[in-house]
């Protein structure tokens, strides 16, 4: 008897979680590791949100809720879309799930079949291709270029479209690059989605974490026709430092949301009741802490980009949003340390961890090998020391 399914055997653990686990294991041994691997804000959840959760507990709001979320939270999400994006939705067009990843997974299971193709620009968030594959569809990877700000061009997108194209995955601002699409960029994607009849899955989880006065535009807001073809994947995790609360949400066509609700009813059922109440406060309560977090992230971004670009042989694109940089280390490929040659980003990441005691995530996991992802969701002190360690380690490569 075969123990594991082919589906299970086809999967590997999330590389970002694996890197963090290795770094924590070293730290447990007393080794001082500086981690740039985190995919979550280093700030605490704002106090008003925590108090809303405490109130929910004290009032006994600890039972099952409707599968797709409580009406109060759906209304808060609807209010958020109207306020921030000039988008109008009904409760039946909103689904609350156990995090943004769960939202994407539900969506993939609801709309993809064997033979469908899903266009994913690279660099991409590590979980997109596996979740598409788990739904028996084929991820079609389209490479982007550093000189274009890691954004897919209309020409490259057009080349990837076939009669089997079911959806295009848009992540703006992006994990891992921090690139963000302007309204003008999005209008070109809209034209192709409508003319070639495919869905746009818009992951907007980093919407509020943007810099230099960038104006975020939700692609669904551009016209009614594209809104019908767009499914927005969102959540409270990044904006409100609520990664552990596990609340994501989806907005889209009623038929799709209903199917996702059915899938969720047979898997997790409802998201945590207490987290739902906290998320209501996050979305409709005061937003003071968000601005403070973004301001701190922007200061860190400015420092880390400037510092990386001063390291010989390293180039770092300046991100527009999120809290990651994606520097290019290709000039160090082919060099060696103690007989071991660096010929890909995985070996370089291992080198940084073993020699510099710095954890980064190899770019190959995001579909872009010459790069490493560094999160600046950590203290300025750690950023300074971590980059000093990286620079010193690189000097040892010959």
Residue locations for each model-derived region?
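PLP-dependent class I/II
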Residues: 2-4, 12-14, 19, 26-32, ...
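Substrate/cofactor-recognition hotspot
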Residues: 8
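Generic structural signal for well-ordered alpha-helical scaffold segments
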Residues: 24, 78, 82, 108-109
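A glycine-/small-polar-enriched, mobile loop at the entrance of the PLP active site in fold-type I
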Residues: 37-40, 55-73
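Conserved N-terminal alpha-helix of the aminotransferase class I/II PLP-enzyme fold
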Residues: 64-97
């Amino acid at each position: 008897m075969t123990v594991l399914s082919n589906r299970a055997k086809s999967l590997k653990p999330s590389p970002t979680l694996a890197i963090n686990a290795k770094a924590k294991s070293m730290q447990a041994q007393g080794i001082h590791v500086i981690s740039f691997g985190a995919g979550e804000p280093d700030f605490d959840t704002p106090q008003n949100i925590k108090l809303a959760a405490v109130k929910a507990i004290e009032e006994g709001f600890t039972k099952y809720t409707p599968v797709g979320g409580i009406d109060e939270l759906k209304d808060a999400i609807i209010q958020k879309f109207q306020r921030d994006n000039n988008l109008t939705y009904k409760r039946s067009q909103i689904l609350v799930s156990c995090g943004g990843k769960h939202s994407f997974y539900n969506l993939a299971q609801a709309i993809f079949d064997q033979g469908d193709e899903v266009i994913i620009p690279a660099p991409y968030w590590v979980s997109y291709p596996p979740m598409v594959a788990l739904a028996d569809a084929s991820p079609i990877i389209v490479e982007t270029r550093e000189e274009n700000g890691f954004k897919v061009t209309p020409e490259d997108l057009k080349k990837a479209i076939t009669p089997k194209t079911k959806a295009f995955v848009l992540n703006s601002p992006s994990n891992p690059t921090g690139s963000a699409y302007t309204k003008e960029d999005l209008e070109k994607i809209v034209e192709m989605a409508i003319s070639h009849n495919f869905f746009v899955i818009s992951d907007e989880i980093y919407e509020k974490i943007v810099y230099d006065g960038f104006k975020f535009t939700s692609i669904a807001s551009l016209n009614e026709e594209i809104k019908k073809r767009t499914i927005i994947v969102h959540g409270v995790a990044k904006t409100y430092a609520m990664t552990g609360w596990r609340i994501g949400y989806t907005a889209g066509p009623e038929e799709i949301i209903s199917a996702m609700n059915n899938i969720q009813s047979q898997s997790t059922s409802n998201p945590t009741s207490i987290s739902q109440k906290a998320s209501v406060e996050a979305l409709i309560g005061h937003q003071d802490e968000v601005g403070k977090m973004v301001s701190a992230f922007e200061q860190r971004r400015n420092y880390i980009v400037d510092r990386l670009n001063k390291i010989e042989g390293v180039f770092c694109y300046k991100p527009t949003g999120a809290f990651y940089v994606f520097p290019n280390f290709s000039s160090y490929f082919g060099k060696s340390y103690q007989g071991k040659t660096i010929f890909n980003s995985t070996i370089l990441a291992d080198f940084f961890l073993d020699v510099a005691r710095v954890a980064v995530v190899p770019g190959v996991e995001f579909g872009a090998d010459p790069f490493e992802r560094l999160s600046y969701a950590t203290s300025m002190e750690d950023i300074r020391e971590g980059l000093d360690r990286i620079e010193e380690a690189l000097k040892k490569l010959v």
